[in-house]
Amino acid sequence: MEFQLFLPQMRMTLATMAERVQTAVDAGFDGVALMDHLAPPMAEAQPMWDAMVAASWLGAKTTGTVGHLVLCDAFRHPAVLARQAVSLDHATDGRFELGIGWGSVPTEFPTFGVGSTEPRARVDRLTETFEVLQALWSGDIVSYEGEHHTLVDAQQAPGPEHHIPIVIGGAGPRTLDLVARFADWWNLPIHKLDQFDELREKAGNARPSLQERVTFVPEGGDRDEIIGTALRRFSDTGHAKGNAEELIEHFAARQAAGIERTYVWTSDFANPDTLQEFGETVIATLR
């Protein structure tokens, strides 16, 4: 199983983020995934860094993969996104992954005036985005006419230096169609985990992943205090809790069920000691 650190780009400086991500990579994590919002969900007044700028910074300052879980399609024109993704592919020597979806917080759209809140329109737009990305990355001259995007004799250079992995999250029928057509990784919403076997057949060849909140009890730690603090901060839904032995068992079961990657969202905001011990115990054992 691969392990990625999910680290929302808030509550800490960019320099601190780089330190924690590199600690995670040194401990065995494969890389980092950021979020993409115009205001932090349920914490709108908190400061937050831009998703693509933060990915560029971490790509330069750390050695693992960098990506997002996931970019919101409505925030960027696909021609802009195509250029950004290729630039990051070259800058990171192939360590950038393009995670993208049609938006998990629809209230952002009218607040910032970025697009329709209607699900059908958002999925249609995302479909066109993938088609435009593929066309522009080919290096050919592109003319494209869709409902949401129009290009006339457009061309971009350079193209990708490496294959840019595509990560798509979701479980709806049209989202799964996009996963089967375009994705390398399919991130299954944890509330749909009980439908995994049924849905996996519709995801094509995309490799399945899962995001989980994790509360890690280190050796010698106060279990009741650590878990109690986490449950006061966060929901118990989709929340793995325990010491190294318990979490090894938990993720081994996920692995046996067919999950190939976990995005670990630590409840202590990526405390370096937690990252190091989790890597040395849980990740090392499962590998």
Residue ranges and their predicted role:
Residues 1-287:
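Active-site-adjacent structural elements that line small-molecule/cofactor binding pockets in enzymes
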